[in-house]
């Protein structure tokens, strides 16, 4: 059974997060909702409130097989600013563990340089954050250990 950590911040796109979490749990994955905000209560970009299972500081990201970054604004910017999360992403990438990002969230990986030389996609308007990437308009693309998705319709 895969262990997935979904990283959450206020202003995330609810469907991108919760649809993915729902499908993964139905498939038998152990999914933990991890807040990077210091609070378990998360408010999505459409003012839907829900609870994270854990705070970032209460978890060990190295225990996860998959790190998942939902999109949405300003949630993506909050994820991008979290140094602990960026360190966990770098470590996971070096270890070849799976990383998935949807909508605006691939911009985090792009700005970290993790997508250079890869094929990736993102929400239209964020392509400039994917420097050194072979950009595609495909809905979902996996290149090596990293999967990126264009947006809500591909959750």
Model-derived features: positions:
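Acidic surface patches and DE-rich sequence motifs
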Residues: 43-44
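Active-site-adjacent pocket-lining segments in enzyme domains
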Residues: 3-6, 12, 23-39, 52-155
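Conserved phosphate/oxyanion-binding catalytic-loop motifs
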Residues: 47
């Amino acid at each position: 059974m895969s262990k997935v950590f979904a990283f959450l911040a206020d202003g995330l796109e609810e469907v991108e997060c919760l649809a993915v979490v729902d499908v993964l749990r139905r498939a038998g994955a152990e999914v933990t909702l991890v807040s990077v905000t210091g609070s378990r209560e998360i408010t999505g970009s459409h003012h839907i409130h829900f609870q994270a299972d854990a705070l970032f500081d209460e978890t060990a990201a190295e225990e996860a097989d998959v790190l998942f970054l939902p999109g949405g604004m300003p949630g993506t910017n909050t994820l991008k600013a979290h140094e602990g999360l960026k360190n966990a992403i770098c470590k996971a990438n070096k270890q070849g563990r799976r990383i998935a990002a949807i909508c605006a969230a691939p911009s985090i990986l792009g700005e970290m340089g993790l997508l250079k030389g890869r094929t990736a996609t993102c929400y239209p308007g964020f392509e400039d954050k994917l420097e050194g990437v072979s950009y595609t308009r495909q809905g979902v693309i996996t290149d090596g250990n990293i999967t990126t998705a264009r947006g809500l319709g591909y959750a």
